[in-house]
Design a protein with these regions (language model features):
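Glycine-rich anion-binding loops of enzyme active sites
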Residues: 1-45, 184
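Glycine-/charge-enriched secondary-structure boundary and capping motifs
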Residues: 1-4, 58, 64-75, 79-197
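Short alpha-helical scaffold segments that flank and stabilize functional sites
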Residues: 11, 46, 50, 168-171
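N-terminal low-complexity, intrinsically disordered patches enriched in charged
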Residues: 21, 52, 111-112
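Acidic, glycine-rich loop-and-beta core segments that form the ion-binding/anion-interacting portion
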Residues: 25-72
Length: 197
């Protein structure tokens, strides 16, 4: 009686010729990152352990790095990218999308990159939001573990044809979405199909 479980399911229909996926990804394609609004829906157990249990921070306490309370930072609503993705598919050659959830950026991107290719992602193209830095520092969490647990500031990724890179970035920027070129797709061998370098 004191607990509620809220869930939702979305169902859609797509023409087979319009279906996006790994089979469309080619060497030379460009990986575009779309900024997250915060933790989104993953990593809260670790965030609570580090910030509330280990560091004993108050949810109501103002945090200088965030410019607001810890509670406000942790409760920032998840950005929904559906309209942004639809805008991209309407005007560019999108090969596929990747929603960055549990498993992190590389773990999720591997699902949409076919065998024989690798998405090479440049860590130097963005700075994770302060909440991720704080969790890592105060919890003494290794970078690899952070990158497997959290979105690290990237909530959605689009893989687009190289000639559409500038157009895709312009479309997302016009929609007031933080975005940037994260990397490219190259021929690969057996091993990870996405890697941060």
């Amino acid at each position: 009686p004191d607990h509620y479980d809220v869930s939702a399911t979305g169902v859609g229909v797509v023409e087979a010729d319009d279906l996006l996926g790994p089979d469309r990804v080619r060497p030379g394609d460009v990986v575009i990152a779309m900024g997250s609004s915060g933790l989104h829906s993953n990593g809260y157990s670790l965030a609570r352990k580090v910030l509330l249990e280990i560091d004993r921070m108050s949810l109501a306490g103002h945090v200088e790095e965030f410019g607001r309370t810890l509670g406000e930072e942790l409760l920032e609503p998840t950005r929904i990218y559906a309209k942004d993705c639809l805008a991209l598919t309407a005007e560019t050659q999108v090969r596929t999308f990747c929603h960055v959830t549990g498993g992190g950026l590389a773990g999720n991107l591997e699902r949409v990159v076919p065998h024989g290719l690798v998405a090479e992602l440049d860590r130097g193209t963005w700075t994770p939001a302060p909440v991720f830095t704080m969790i890592a520092q105060r919890g003494r969490i290794e970078r690899a573990e952070m990158e497997k647990t959290f979105n690290m500031g990237i909530g959605m990724v689009a893989v687009v044809a190289p000639e559409d890179t500038d157009r895709a970035l312009a479309i997302l920027t016009a929609r007031h979405l933080s975005c940037w070129t994260l990397g490219t797709v190259a021929k690969g061998k057996d091993g990870p199909r996405a890697k941060l370098v």
